[in-house]
């Protein structure tokens, strides 16, 4: 399996999910290691979703203890459908394989609050050790 960086981001800390199996692997590994996951569901054609990429990357750079995933709803429809994504962008905070928070829309301040609060409340301090084959 290969981790792909988001287009336009040089040293991205955001992992682009290419298929459902990758999603399951990343979420399971993060959960097993006690790390939260923040997932950005968007689309390449959605301007508001694209406008959040920079802020999402910035959060990933400042919170290495959290696994940040990007899911294109057109590429990984099964995961988008399973989580009930109906608008882009949609952001999920996942802990222990369960959705604990959801934000719909391009609201960078709310996403930052969610990420900052999750880092504090989960007390995680080390980055997740994701194994990629």
From Swiss-Prot:
- The organism's place on the tree of life at top rank: Eukaryota
Q: Which PROSITE patterns match?
A: THIOREDOXIN_2
InterPro entries linked: Thioredoxin-like_sf, Thioredoxin_domain, Thioredoxin_H-type-like
All copies of the Thioredoxin domain together span 1-120
Coiled-coil ranges per UniProt: none
Instruction: Check the record and name the SUPFAM superfamilies matching this protein.
Output: Thioredoxin-like
Q: Which Gene3D superfamilies match?
A: Glutaredoxin
Name the protein family.
Belongs to the thioredoxin family.
User: Under what name is this protein listed?
Assistant: Thioredoxin-like protein CXXS1
The organism of origin for this protein: Oryza sativa subsp. japonica (Rice)
- Taxonomic lineage of this organism? Eukaryota, Viridiplantae, Streptophyta, Embryophyta, Tracheophyta
């Amino acid at each position: 399996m290969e981790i792909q960086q988001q287009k336009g981001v040089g040293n991205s800390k955001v992992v682009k999910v290419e298929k459902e199996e990758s999603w399951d692997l990343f979420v399971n590994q993060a959960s097993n290691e006690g790390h939260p996951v923040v997932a950005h569901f968007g689309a390449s054609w959605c301007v508001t979703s694209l406008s959040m990429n920079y802020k999402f990357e910035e959060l990933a750079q400042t919170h290495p203890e959290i696994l940040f995933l990007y899911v294109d709803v057109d590429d990984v429809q099964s995961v988008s459908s399973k989580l009930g994504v109906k608008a882009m962008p949609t952001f999920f905070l996942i802990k222990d394989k369960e959705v604990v928070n959801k934000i719909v829309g391009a609201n960078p301040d709310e996403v930052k609050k969610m990420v900052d609060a999750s880092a504090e409340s989960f007390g995680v301090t080390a980055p997740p050790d994701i194994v990629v084959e």
